[in-house]
Amino acid sequence: MVKIGLEVHVHLTSLKTKLFCSCPSDYTGKDPNTNVCPICLGLPGAIPVLNENAVKAAIMVALAINAEIANSLIMVRKHYFYPDMAKNYQISQYDGPGSIAISKGGYLKLREGKTVRIRRINIEEDPAKIIYPTGSMLTSKYTLLDYNRSGMGLLEIVTEPDMTEPKEAREFLEKLRSILEHLGVCNCDLEGAMRADANVSVEGGERVEIKNIGSPREVEEALKYEIARQKAAIAQGLPVKRETRHWDSERKVTVPTRTKETEEDYRYFPDPDLPPYPITQDLIEEIRKTLPELPDLRIKRLVTQYGISDYDATVLVMDKALADLFEETAKHYSNYKKLVNLLINDYLRWLNDKNLRPSQSKAGSQHLVELLKLLDDGVITIKIAKEILPEIVLEGKMPSSIIKERGLVAIKDEDYLINVIKEVINEEPDAAEKAKNDPKVINYLVGKVMKKTGKRADPQLTNELIKKILGIK
């Protein structure tokens, strides 16, 4: 039996400043170690002050995942010795004596009905960024530290070990990401904005933690590898150590980094510089009123409002930018099913293949409306639409402009198409004969015509002309 639990670290990118000081939270483009102050660097005598907006963001997330919110917030010091934490402790929270996490409980439901319970949400500070300039953690000759990130506000969302397959962990993270984006508390496209530690054990063995994985897809890959590694060790009669491992995304393997600490090793105790922060019911209700439409409700609305399937609505809403693009385009194009098919089967598939997200695309609703109308009017074929998609997405070019530049208008000249079809029939006499009794072979001949015309032949007209020439009724 496999047990999987997750610890998800979410940057509160909606904050203007860091968690305990006034340093800006946006350090994009700044030189290393310039977005810092005595508090970020843990210098003696520097006193932290809690950013109240971080508390409000955490309450929003807790409400969205059906959690029980505490009536006060108590921060603790989590002690460990590692170069990314200058003061040798992290200001965090702990589910134990002397601390109160901002929320406990809660859950998310996966597509097939499985419930993943959430143990708690903690507010904590982010450590510095460790850089390996000449390779990976294992191969780099030296290490650099950038404290620009140190002290950024984080939420740590800890699940129970309710998942049994890597694909469930990926789905959980994708759904959580959608919630965070709908709430507006995290821009998950930013590097490192959402990272996960995956804990996994096989057949009741020791728990292994895979640290700092950058995306839902990589979490799935890392877990697949780690489960296979543990099963192989068990089959050979070898022990599985309780340890922390690193996911090497280039080699697609996990590698050991250190023995896994126990809770006692961290020597938690309340931070004397940060008094308890009260959370009133009035504050919770005030924040509840500001919650936007969340993914589950949006899925139901899309099904009702646009008549699309529950599956299609779910795929759209799992990425807020994709759902937003659908709804904006639907204001100007009423064939919703055709729009969904283009978005999911062509647009999203291409983005996934290139490891891009919809929010990184330069295609807007105006691009999609024009592309769909060109298809409806028979000006281009679906093959041409797929061919020009990269230029639309990466450069933001209008479809009509690309078609004009590259001469990609669909060919509807019957005389021209008949000549091409006759060429194909002469080259493929056996296929032409089989086509008289097998409709599937007609599609093969259509494909040959498309190839000869650079994908520009109108497929429906070509199909009709082939049947006419071969005497197929």
From Swiss-Prot:
Stretches that traverse the bilayer: none
Gene Ontology MF terms: asparaginyl-tRNA synthase (glutamine-hydrolyzing) activity; ATP binding; glutaminyl-tRNA synthase (glutamine-hydrolyzing) activity
UniProt superkingdom: Archaea
Gene Ontology process terms (BP): glutaminyl-tRNAGln biosynthesis via transamidation; translation
Keyword Nucleotide-binding: yes
Signal peptide range: none
Enzyme Commission code: 6.3.5.-
Catalytic activity reported: L-glutamyl-tRNA(Gln) + L-glutamine + ATP + H2O = L-glutaminyl-tRNA(Gln) + L-glutamate + ADP + phosphate + H(+); L-aspartyl-tRNA(Asn) + L-glutamine + ATP + H2O = L-asparaginyl-tRNA(Asn) + L-glutamate + ADP + phosphate + 2 H(+)
Keywords: ATP-binding, Ligase, Nucleotide-binding, Protein biosynthesis
Gene3D superfamilies reported in the protein's UniProt record: 1.10.10.410, GatB domain, N-terminal subdomain
Enzyme class: ligase
Signal is among the record's keywords: no
InterPro entries: Asn/Gln-tRNA_amidoTrfase_suB/E (IPR017959), Asn/Gln-tRNA_Trfase_suB/E_cat (IPR006075), Asn/Gln_amidotransferase (IPR018027), Asn/Gln_tRNA_amidoTrase-B-like (IPR003789), GatB (IPR004413), GatB_C_1 (IPR042114), GatB_Yqey_C_2 (IPR023168), Gln-tRNA_amidoTrfase_suB_CS (IPR017958)
Subunit description: Heterotrimer of A, B and C subunits.
Family assignment from sequence similarity: Belongs to the GatB/GatE family. GatB subfamily.
Function noted in UniProt: Allows the formation of correctly charged Asn-tRNA(Asn) or Gln-tRNA(Gln) through the transamidation of misacylated Asp-tRNA(Asn) or Glu-tRNA(Gln) in organisms which lack either or both of asparaginyl-tRNA or glutaminyl-tRNA synthetases. The reaction takes place in the presence of glutamine and ATP through an activated phospho-Asp-tRNA(Asn) or phospho-Glu-tRNA(Gln).
NCBIfam families for the chain: gatB, PRK05477.1-2, PRK05477.1-4
Family matches, as HAMAP family: GatB
Record protein name field: Aspartyl/glutamyl-tRNA(Asn/Gln) amidotransferase subunit B
Primary gene name: gatB
